[in-house]
Amino acid sequence: MSGGDGIPTFKLVLVGDGGTGKTTFVKRHLTGEFEKKYVATLGVEVHPLVFHTNRGQIRFNVWDTAGQEKFGGLRDGYYIQGQCAIIMFDVTARVTYKNVPNWHRDLARVCENIPIVLCGNKVDVKDRKVKAKTITFHRKKNLQYYDISAKSNYNFEKPFLWLARKLLGDPNLEFVAMPALAPPEVQMDPAMIAEYEKDLDNAAKADLPDDDDDL
């Protein structure tokens, strides 16, 4: 699917509990923030996020709920024709991870078999509650997972690169230049990053629990 300018363009549905940092995350991409459009009928902001790859440009039209999820579920119109998705939770609030299966169920009901990335946001906050070893939902449902920190730009591009590779069917796709991002509001401690990356590696090798105690 191309935009009018020939750039491959995909609808990306961004979901997760209110307050997990979805809007903060999408606003990091400065041109997308500048060019966003408001869809009044659905009460949604659509941010066109363009990335430069070794195969040319790719655009994600990221649909952001503008906080409607605080009032219950989202209308089907939000999901319809979604081609990929990011489910976000807050690693400092366990309840937001507990609700991930509900968001996944809503997505899967309307958008069958689309590539989905699960993101644990706010890993810059020292008091992390949802640890790597308890994050197993993505392994059960064949999703990709990334720790992210919207406010520090940590791993900002990772979900988009993984989705771009899936959507374009090219596992060797690379981003050749980073988009202009808002300056970091916080700095990630390199030692903490190294520790979290090691924790995720170890968690990926661990056996999955038989039950759903992690949810």
UniProtKB/Swiss-Prot annotation:
Q: Name one Pfam family in it.
A: Ras
Q: Which cysteines are joined by disulfide bonds?
A: none
Q: Name one GO cellular component term.
A: nucleus
Which residue range or ranges hold the Small GTPase Ran-type domain? 6-170
Q: Which GO terms describe its molecular function?
A: GTP binding; GTPase activity
Q: Which residues form a coiled coil?
A: none
Q: How does it assemble?
A: Found in a nuclear export complex with RanGTP, exportin and pre-miRNA.
What more does the record tell us? Loss of ran-1 results in failure of correct attachment of kinetochore microtubules to mitotic chromosomes and the resultant loss of correct chromosome segregation. The number and the location of centrosomes are normal, and astral microtubules also seem unaffected. Nuclear envelope is not reestablished at the end of each cell division.
Could you tell me what this protein is called?
GTP-binding nuclear protein ran-1
Name the gene that codes for it. Answer: ran-1
